[in-house]
Structures are given as C-alpha cells and as structure tokens.
C-alpha cells in the first residue's frame, strides 16, 4: 500500500495519468485528471462501472469551477458555490467543457465544491478539478478506510492519500442545478 501525505506528490501522480484514492466528506474516493481519458477509463475498469453513467468532478475552490460557473445564470451559480450542510454534487448542463468519457450519456456533468480540507488541498496542488467516484467495485460498499481501499484495489492504484475522512454520514447528494430537484439523497 503506497500511502502518501504530500499533496504535491499526489498532484504529480495525477498529472502523469495516475489514479489515486483519497478521503472525501463521507467515503473514500478514486480520483484522476478528468481530461486524461486513459486515467478515467482505468477508474471505470477498476470499478466495473459503465461509462454511460458518468462521473462526478470535485473542486476545492470556487476558481476551479469557473468554466462551469460561466455557463450558469447568477442564481444557479450562487447555488453551486453556496455552503451546504450536506455535501452536494450539482448536475450542470455541459456539452463543451467536460469530455464525454466523464459525462457518460449525459449532456451534463455533476460537480461538487468540497468543504473537506484534504480535498481542497489536493485540488489546489493539482490546480483544478479531479474525478470523484466512490472507492469500491460495483455492487460493494464504498471503502471507509485506506485499508479497505487496498483490499479492493491492491496495487492497481498509484497512491492512497494518507488523510482523514470527513464527518458526513452519507456520500454527497446529487441535485439538478437549474431545478434543485434531488437525484440521489
């Protein structure tokens, strides 16, 4: 198990096309550069997840979301960047910014502004958004520890971020940015 504490080292791994595991607000996630097709496909293969479902992107700061914020009216943009008690991923219309291998069969993408410090530090070091999908093969419960990540994926990921999980009891809810409709509680 390759535990890493340096966000700069993790960001370099991501830039080089690597796949990492990292603690999110509630569960462990797998992450990579969303614009690196081979890295995204590697995550999809590790999880046995169909590309058609799409993946969530996570940011640690508002500036990292500016390409998507520019597509939204003021009310929707404010909804995306507002602080939520519950981690929330917002489904945003998108056909031009996010690659199809991240969007799946959708004309939209789910993005989240994380309030979890390890995620914020990681995205800042990477200088952008990263993929955020639960660290588990399809049909199994998400990993709740670095040890569980290792049990699921062994040496098939490049690093595990040695940092604490957040305090949320559930993975992020997923809502439509335009209607506020709930897709996943």
UniProtKB/Swiss-Prot annotation:
PROSITE patterns: YRDC (PS51163). One of its GO terms (molecular function) is ATP binding. GO terms for cellular component: cytoplasm. The keyword NADP does not apply. Pfam families: Sua5_yciO_yrdC (PF01300). It is found in: Cytoplasm. InterPro entries: DHBP_synth_RibB-like_a/b_dom (IPR017945), Sua5-like_dom (IPR006070), TC-AMP_synthase (IPR023535), TC-AMP_synthase_SUA5 (IPR050156). It comes from the Bacteria. It catalyses: L-threonine + hydrogencarbonate + ATP = L-threonylcarbamoyladenylate + diphosphate + H2O. Residues 4-185 form the YrdC-like domain. It is an enzyme of class 2 (transferase). Keywords: ATP-binding, Cytoplasm, Nucleotide-binding, Nucleotidyltransferase, Transferase, tRNA processing. The keyword Manganese does not apply. Its EC number is 2.7.7.87. GO terms for biological process: regulation of translational fidelity; tRNA threonylcarbamoyladenosine modification. Required for the formation of a threonylcarbamoyl group on adenosine at position 37 (t(6)A37) in tRNAs that read codons beginning with adenine. Catalyzes the conversion of L-threonine, HCO(3)(-)/CO(2) and ATP to give threonylcarbamoyl-AMP (TC-AMP) as the acyladenylate intermediate, with the release of diphosphate. Belongs to the SUA5 family. TsaC subfamily. This is Threonylcarbamoyl-AMP synthase. It comes from Marinomonas sp. (strain MWYL1).
